[in-house]
């Protein structure tokens, strides 16, 4: 905002998301979670504030000039559009928002995004592909991979066409190089089960008034995972904690749904000490509300 859209966005210095690409993916993954909070906010000013925060977060992700961020945003938009009840209306809205956001970006942003189609002329992209080849060859010759920190001169000398050690810049090739095909299979299977569990929440809690928020959590967790799956294909963030936090939310949500916890919570949830609430508690045979 200070640079009027002409500066590249960077993360906090010295943090895990200091790099523009890492920050962009972290921002993108949080947008659906902000939407979840907005959907269940009770006050209009909170809803408006979260809407503004989502717009600014998307602009910040684009302003990072991360090509992976652009692809991740497109993936999330595709999931939202596919699940939309009115695809024509929502498609137009997404298109207008996308065009308006891109119009805010500087000329060097457009030039950088154009390199997606001309990756053969981009030194950064070719370096990543070389690292991917190294990871593939390493896993092919070592059943359980090379362990952590495989970006060494020795490994690139033996398994890469160009001896230029660098990170894999892909969650998939990162896991492949470090843990082999077995590790990659387990990693993908884990996230597939999380996706299925989130889908279960989306469908099973949809018609339960007390648990409808859980249906929204499942649906929007899938949107976040779609963004991470696409954006993470170009970043070494296989151990980034935010997606695992979503995993925990989905697992806990499924356990909460399975034991129908809202029934128990309705009995134990504290209520304001009012005359009406005391009367309701007495009629229902529940403990009276405690005074503040």
What residues fall within each predicted segment?
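A membrane-periplasm/extracellular boundary helix in multi-pass inner-membrane enzymes
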Residues: 1-4, 59-64, 81-123, 133-140, ...
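Transmembrane alpha-helices of multi-pass inner-membrane enzymes
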Residues: 91-96, 193, 223-285, 289-292
């Amino acid at each position: 905002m200070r640079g009027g859209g002409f500066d590249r966005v960077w993360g906090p210095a010295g943090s895990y998301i200091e790099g523009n690409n890492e920050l962009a993916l972290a921002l993108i993954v949080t947008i659906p979670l902000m939407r979840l909070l907005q959907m269940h906010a009770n006050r209009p000013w909170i809803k408006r504030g979260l809407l503004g925060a989502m717009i600014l977060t998307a602009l910040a992700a684009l302003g990072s000039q991360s090509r992976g961020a652009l692809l991740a945003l497109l993936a999330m938009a595709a999931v939202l559009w596919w699940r939309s009840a009115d695809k024509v209306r929502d498609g137009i809205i997404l298109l207008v928002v996308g065009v308006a956001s891109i119009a805010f970006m500087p000329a060097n942003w457009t030039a950088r995004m154009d390199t997606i189609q001309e990756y053969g002329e981009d030194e950064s992209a070719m370096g990543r592909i070389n690292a991917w080849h190294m990871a593939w060859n390493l896993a092919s010759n070592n059943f359980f991979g090379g362990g952590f920190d495989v970006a060494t001169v020795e490994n690139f000398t033996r398994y890469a066409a160009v001896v230029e050690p660098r990170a894999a810049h892909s969650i998939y090739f990162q896991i492949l190089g470090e843990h082999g095909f077995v590790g990659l299979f387990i990693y993908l299977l884990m996230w597939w089960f999380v996706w299925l569990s989130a889908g279960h929440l989306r469908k099973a809690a949809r018609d339960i008034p007390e648990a409808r928020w859980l249906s929204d959590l499942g649906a929007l967790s899938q949107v976040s995972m779609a963004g991470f799956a696409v954006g993470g294909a170009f970043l070494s963030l296989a151990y980034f904690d935010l997606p695992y936090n979503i995993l925990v939310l989905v697992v806990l949500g499924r356990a909460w749904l399975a034991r129908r916890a809202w029934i128990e919570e309705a009995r134990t949830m504290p209520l304001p000490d009012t005359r009406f609430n005391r009367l309701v508690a007495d009629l229902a045979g529940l403990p009276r509300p405690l005074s503040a």
